[in-house]
Amino acid sequence: MKLLEKMTYVECFMIIMATWFMFISYSHGANVAAAPGTNGLDTAWYDARAAYYGDIHGGGTELEGACGYGDLNKHGYGLATAALSTALFNSGASCGACYEIMCSPNPQGCLSGSIKITATDLCPPGSAWCYLPNKHFDLSLPMFIKIAQVKAKMVPVRYRRVPCAKTGGVKFEVKGNPNILTILPYNVGGAGDIIAVSAKGSKTAWVVMSRYWGQNWTTNVNLTGQSVSLRVTTSDGITKDFTDVMPASWGFGQTFDGKTNF
């Protein structure tokens, strides 16, 4: 009582409002979008649909794909991948992003549990469910049957962004020719999807690279014969420098290990 007597009306009002807000937030938690976590990702759940492609052995994952990763097994992505509809693919900007997906409760054919996948391709535009504004995931069959019965063929799902857990450092595959240097970063942890790449030769200043297609980044600055450092920024705003990741003797077709990750 003595404590209350010393409090002003304003202080009492602020405490009451704070308590009311906490009550509303917790009691309606299922309807409140989750705020971005410390990793800067939007962790709210959204609705979409999912189907599958290929066979039980993962057929189809060895194809190039719209992100440019090529053979997904060779590049370490394996079967835990998905082709995204146009709305989610975002012209290739979502390549490398990781998602947690679970079948929506109750629909026939759904199984409990969830899966985590990396975005590596664009869902075929010829499929009606891949057109704008539909949100859709084409999963490899081995991943689909972890959340739904194969006979369901297509199911409603819920999805959210999650940090990518990758083993080892970021890898950089060198493509192109002396006139156009193209870099494919892969095995990217953290947010996974990249929004900017810059390159610096041992004799040049930093050069901003352009997204060529998918996750391929390019510049027409000739860096042949120079050791090359690469600067990568992921969608959560984190930037990491990979100093002299490419030695002066680098060549086209080679892949270099950044040693560290996000």
From Swiss-Prot:
It is a peripheral membrane protein. Keywords: Cell wall, Cell wall biogenesis/degradation, Membrane, Secreted, Signal. SUPFAM superfamilies: Barwin-like endoglucanases, PHL pollen allergen. CDD domains: DPBB_EXPA_N. Residues 179-258 form the Expansin-like CBD domain. Residues 64-169 form the Expansin-like EG45 domain. GO terms for biological process: anatomical structure morphogenesis; plant-type cell wall loosening. Residues 1-29 form the signal peptide. Its main location: secreted. It is found in: Secreted, Cell wall; Membrane. The keyword Secreted applies. InterPro entries: Expan_Lol_pI (IPR007118), Expansin (IPR002963), Expansin/allergen_DPBB_dom (IPR007112), Expansin_CBD (IPR007117), Expansin_CBD_sf (IPR036749), RlpA-like_DPBB (IPR009009), RlpA-like_sf (IPR036908). Belongs to the expansin family. Expansin A subfamily. Causes loosening and extension of plant cell walls by disrupting non-covalent bonding between cellulose microfibrils and matrix glucans. No enzymatic activity has been found. This is Expansin-A21. It comes from Arabidopsis thaliana.
